[in-house]
Amino acid sequence: MLTVRLVGKTILASLLIEEARKLQSVTAVFFYCKYHDPQRDSFLAVARSLLWQLLRHDGKLQQDNDLLAFFYENVAASGDESLQSIKLAKDMLTIAIQKFDKVYIILDGLDECPVKEKKLISSWFCDVVDGCYDTEAEAMRCLFISQDDNDCGKLLGRLPTVKVSSSDNNSDILAFCHSWEKQIQLKFYLPEPEVQFIGTEVAKRAGGKDTVLGEEDKSNMV
């Protein structure tokens, strides 16, 4: 179990997820929390997404008819169209995780959840990982990535922590800005000194925080 507290975290989370999914011996699942989004800021939202990913991972769980029957019967018995019970979500997720030899879970943006949900998410995953250590230490790994707020600091204080400040991101952001200079220069016919100034100024104003560009933003630049 590890927590990473930093600014400009989303790109780092994406890179870690990409690398984890390349590992042949590991089942890597992930979730991006989002502030004030009911579909992405609660334990139930996390559990639903992770269950879906585990079920789709490589067909292993889809071939387990007993497990699928268990999931279906319990959700059907609840009378809800979707998974709404926190207790049932915990039970289903625990059983699903145990079906795999090694699971890596990456949760980005815990700080964007309400305090109650932060507590629920962090405490449950900590308990599950601790349980794995009692039986098979390599069975599960969990990484929390968040801004360094007071709540997460208290909830995850006992975990190994890597702190990344804005100054740690500056060189990467500057390199990214410089990589776009040539394309900007070709489109707007700018002299070399001016386009270099733009790249340096954008990096400076970013303040160490990453900016994710959509496809429309990129097309407007090139």
Descriptions of predicted regions:
Residues 1-222:
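Conserved NB-ARC/NACHT P-loop NTPase core of NLR-like innate immune receptors
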